[in-house]
Amino acid sequence: MQPIQLFELASRQAEWLSARQEIVAGNIANADTPKYRAKDVTPFNAVLDQTHIGMARTHAGHIRDMSSRQNVDVVDAKLDQEIGIQESGNTVGLAEELSKSGEIKRQYELNTQLIKSFHRMMLMTVKK
């Protein structure tokens, strides 16, 4: 039997969500700073690719190998056409950053709910 990697995967995602929330909070804090450039982190898929955590392939037709490796970095956020560069010269859009913050919250809640459910299933299995 192969080890269950769900807990490690969830832990990695929680770390990534924490880092992203920190960057988004920094963007919000600097919304009025002249010439401040909004930042974001690389997508979680890139982080997942780097950690070499994946699902076990038990049959050749089940999972395709996605071998794109990227660095996890803080990068300048893409300019939204609506926001663009403001008079102060910065690229922070409060509505967009608050939306990102809400998305991070939902992803974190989903992450913790999945772990709780999986933990309950494991406990039920052990008790029987």
Q: Locations of the language-model features?
A:
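Amphipathic alpha-helical polymerization modules
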Residues: 1-128
